Design a protein with these regions (language model features):
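Extracellular adhesion/carbohydrate-binding repeat motifs centered on closely spaced tryptophans
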Residues: 1-247
């Protein structure tokens, strides 16, 4: 008579038939709505667990009105406190601690892909740069999706400026206070060629010859040093020579 919780009923084949809310050892047929059991809630109707209730449900729970993510009639307390996505009404929504967070703007990972969420909902219309938590770093989003493997020079708006920007590992690094150090920081390619990059932006005003070099590992013990010479005219690389200097 001391048991209070959910009890499962099985058919003659041993398969679960349904589940019921038991209070003090007896099925409580008078219970309707959300019932708290330990650290989670269940939704019952005339004492029976509504196991076919799934997805987002609008309800007032513990005095808090909101949209809640329900799994087979059960609302779990998500103590991990991270964002997940849940599909409802043609949209994907950001859920935090089992509740839709309409104030959230940022990224949420789902099935190995990071999505851009705006005001609690994945914005599939978003293509362009968005702020990140890292200083001077902007993530490039295509149709709401962030692709960390994306490289290239793309035309977009960044901080109110429309220009050609370098995207590397899905991000553009651009500082409002960066100073010219005498040569391009790096180079980025698109369908029109290879371009000189200064402070994350294609530098159309750069013309000249620029030399760079880097080491490449060829084994645990050995590496090679490659020297690069770029000829640049109005930001476009017109020729590039690579020379292996030593090994």
């Amino acid at each position: 008579f001391s048991y209070t919780g959910i009890a499962e009923r099985y058919d003659q084949n041993g398969d679960k038939f349904d589940s019921w809310y038991v209070r003090n050892g007896q099925v409580d047929f008078s219970s309707n709505g959300w019932v708290k059991i330990n650290n989670h809630y269940v939704y019952v109707r005339n004492g029976m667990l509504q196991s076919d209730l799934n997805g987002l449900v609008q309800a007032t729970i513990d005095g808090k009105d909101g949209w809640w993510e329900v799994d087979h009639g059960t609302l779990f307390d998500n103590t991990n406190y991270y964002y997940t996505l849940c599909y409802y009404g043609g949209s994907w929504w950001a859920v935090y601690n089992s509740q839709v967070d309409f104030s959230y703007t940022g990224f949420v990972e789902h099935d190995g892909t990071r999505w851009y969420v705006e005001n609690g909902r994945v914005n599939f219309d978003k293509t362009g740069f968005v702020n990140t938590e890292e200083a001077d770093t902007y993530a490039y989003v295509q149709n709401g999706q962030y692709n960390k493997t994306f490289y290239g020079a793309i035309y977009a708006e960044l901080n109110g400026k429309n220009s050609w920007w370098q995207v590397k590992d899905g991000n553009c690094v651009h500082s409002a206070n960066a100073a010219w150090n005498g040569k391009p920081d790096s180079f980025a390619a698109n369908e029109n060629g290879l371009w000189a990059i200064v402070n994350g932006e294609v530098a159309f005003d750069v013309t000249g010859e620029y030399s760079y070099g880097t080491y490449y590992s060829v084994s645990r013990e050995d590496s090679i040093y490659v020297s690069y010479i770029y000829q640049v005219e109005n930001g476009l690389v017109t020729s590039m020579q690579a020379t292996v200097l030593d090994r």
